[in-house]
Amino acid sequence: VKELGQMWQVDYSDLDNLRIEQQNTHKFLHDGFFDPTQRYFQIAANASNRMEFIDTETRKAVGSLVTGKKPHPGAGANWIDPKCGPVAGTTHLGEGKVTVWGNDPKGHPDQAWKICYSVESDGPGLFIRTHPNSDYVIFDQTKHPEPEIQQAIKVLDKKTGKIVKTIQVTDVETALAVHTEFNADGSEFWVSVWVRGGKKNWLKGEIVVYDSKTLKEITRVKGLETPTGKFNVSNRMHHRT
């Protein structure tokens, strides 16, 4: 419940007798995602510059971590780091940074709910995504005021924890690049091009498709009206983040 600074967990196994349990958190809650086991819920408290972590089995908060200015993970990203084991990451609305933390309290208790590393980017962003079959984590820089930076996405190597490529998605003056989504097998990732400027530009949007191995452009789906979020049904059903 965003404005209250509370997480409400609803047990709907008996619809006639719903049970709601409340956990106090920092404010304001916005955008969350589960770890790969689907036990721990990871959610941004962006006004407090924190990520909050809830154990959905015990229904208790297990951690709270300062990550940077206004974390905004979108649908989030989970992957395996060579040093820290299972990790997750977030972009930030208030600064150009991706923060990565451990999220495996059973297998890697020393790393759980602690920062593994942070990486600086060129500007603040909205969304971060990956896929188990991809070597990379992709994130945007949509909130930076300079068009050239808004129009580019960054590629983070899972093995090294370093940014290995900047992809200029568009060079249209009033456009920006936003929101990455992988296809079901992780062989492609799709990025939206969102064109501003009123009705005259409504149908100038695009979805750009990239090869997730070579990072090269495959094709562009053109003539779209301000495309933004793209959600692969298979990935969401099987919790591939």
Where are these regions (language model features)?
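Predominantly soluble domains enriched in secretory-pathway, periplasmic, or organellar proteins
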Residues: 1-241
